[in-house]
Regions:
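Alpha-helical transmembrane segments of multi-pass membrane proteins predominantly involved
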Residues: 1-278
């Protein structure tokens, strides 16, 4: 949540700011509408251009630079930059369809991102377990630390792979439909940017597949046996029932979204319509 909630707050602020800049009558107070709205309306076109430029840069930087990363957190950071590109692209258009795509993308990104970090945290707990002395959690830092995890924690690896495939936009997972919704909403206005987004997403999918290849098809040659002194007591891994349940529920939502998508889609549609005044 520490890494996810600030991004959501900034994106929601940009959503409101994009409406003010483009002159849409959204549900703001009269004072705010008259002051901030009048301030940014003359800069509507430059603001939209800025969002489009930032979107394209996010696609290129997030996917191309991410290919050279070998640390897990840095790779996920550039992955986030790529996802922000899709949301900025939807904000730049500011139509009912694009806002609906923005809301849906934000929801699926939050679910997938939380599931990814919960799974990585569970990897650390499951690998080392709890010792009564210090440092009870092994932190996964490098991509090579994920080698052969399928042979140790198959269920966690499957959950992690589902999140990675969703972030890569592979059907029929939730991430695919989110990207499709955003690209469809902007395809008529900015088809060239849609092409850039598709090409860079295909390139960026390779580093997600690299992680899957490490977990499923390579064995860890390092000795991962926990060495303890006689005074140390190795207890059960610190993966609580709540932790496991949240991972299981999020994985099911991401993977089985296709079979019952009406609830989330209708909610996003109603929310986007509520932002526009008739």
């Amino acid at each position: 949540w520490v890494s996810t909630m600030p991004k959501i707050g900034i994106l929601v602020f940009l959503l409101n700011l994009s409406f003010l800049a483009t002159g849409y009558d959204i549900q703001w107070s009269t004072v705010v509408q008259d002051t901030i709205g009048n301030l940014y309306t003359p800069y509507a076109q430059p603001f939209q251009t800025l969002l489009l430029v930032c979107s394209v840069l996010s696609f290129v930087v997030g996917n191309i630079v991410g290919l050279s990363q070998y640390r897990i957190k840095r790779l996920l950071t550039f992955s986030t930059i790529n996802h922000l590109g899709f949301m900025l692209l939807a904000l730049a258009v500011s139509t009912e369809e694009s806002v609906e795509g923005f809301v849906f993308y934000l929801v699926q990104y939050t679910l997938t991102n939380v599931n990814t970090f919960l799974t990585l945290l569970a990897f650390g707990y499951m690998t080392k377990g709890i010792l009564q002395n210090k440092s009870n959690v092994r932190e996964f830092v490098l991509l090579d630390d994920l080698k052969g995890q399928f042979y140790k924690n198959p269920l966690l690896v499957i959950s992690f792979a589902v999140s990675l495939f969703s972030m890569a936009g592979i059907p029929p997972l939730m991430g695919f439909f989110a990207k499709q919704m955003v690209l469809y909403s902007v395809s008529y206005s900015y088809s060239y940017i849609s092409i850039v987004a598709i090409i860079t997403s295909v390139i960026g999918a390779s580093y997600y597949l690299k992680i899957v290849q490490l977990m499923f098809f390579q064995k860890d040659s390092a000795n991962t046996t926990i060495q303890t002194d006689s005074s140390e007591e190795v207890q059960q891994p610190l993966v609580t029932t709540m932790h496991s349940s949240v991972i299981a529920v999020l994985t099911l939502i991401i993977s089985l979204y296709l079979f019952d998508s009406s609830i989330l889609l209708n909610a996003c549609h109603l929310l986007s319509l509520s932002l526009f005044s008739v």
